[in-house]
A protein has these predicted regions:
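Catalytic NTP-binding/metal-coordinating core of nucleotidyl cyclase/transferase enzymes
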Residues: 1-58
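Amphipathic alpha-helical regulatory segments at dimerization interfaces
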Residues: 23-30, 62-70, 110, 114, ...
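Structural scaffold positions in well-ordered secondary structure
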Residues: 24, 40, 56, 63, ...
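Catalytic core regions of nucleotide second-messenger enzymes
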Residues: 31-39, 65-81, 140-143, 147
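Catalytic strand-loop-helix junctions within cyclic-nucleotide turnover domains
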Residues: 46-53, 78-97, 117-118
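Amphipathic alpha-helical transducer elements in NTP-driven molecular machines
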Residues: 53, 57-60, 101-108
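Catalytic/regulatory signature loops of cyclic-dinucleotide turnover enzymes
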Residues: 70-71, 103-124
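Cytosolic regulatory/linker segments at or just downstream of nucleotide-handling modules
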Residues: 114-164
Length: 164
């Protein structure tokens, strides 16, 4: 996203972001997710309750398919990580921001940075809790800030075309 923002006038970037966020938020809401933050072209989303992992994966697949069909100026990758978070107000009293905090937030962002456009990178716990049709075999990746590698599986939007 940084290079896209650098190479385009702010008006075009805002137009792109509005189109992208409209697609993403509509789909996340449809699958019962909660949008915590919009940061650049990224969303921080939380799924809770029954079938949370499956709904997160289904939403991610639907987002990548919708972005591809919309022929937006650029694609995106998605990181999914299952773990604990806490919700709370963070910041000085004059500017509190209600958000989710926890290692899971950091890990999902790290997995997102490992995803190519049109791709989901999900940790094994997320995959083991959901139907993993179309995902690659397990692989281990190094994640910034971690000493141990993390087991993940990948899914690419092109898997939908192969299924059809």
């Amino acid at each position: 996203f940084t290079s896209y923002a650098e190479d385009n006038p702010p008006e075009r970037v805002v137009f792109f972001l509005n189109d992208l966020m409209t697609i993403q938020v509509k789909i996340v809401t449809h699958f019962g997710g909660d949008v915590d933050k919009m940061i650049g072209d990224a969303l921080l989303v939380r799924f809770e309750g029954e079938n949370a992992e499956q709904r997160a994966i289904d939403a991610a697949k639907a987002i990548l398919d919708a972005v591809r069909r919309a022929s937006l100026a650029r694609g995106l990758g998605i990181g999914i990580y299952t773990g604990q978070v806490i919700s709370g107000a963070v910041g000085p009293k004059s500017r509190r921001d209600f958000t989710v905090i926890g290692d899971s937030v950091n890990m999902s962002a790290r997995l997102c940075s490992q995803a190519n456009p049109g791709e989901i990178v999900a940790d094994i716990e997320s995959i083991n809790s959901a139907a993993s049709l179309g995902f690659t075999a397990e692989e281990r990746i190094q994640v910034k800030g971690r000493t141990e590698s993390l087991a993940v599986r990948r899914w690419h939007v092109d898997a939908l075309a192969k299924k059809a």
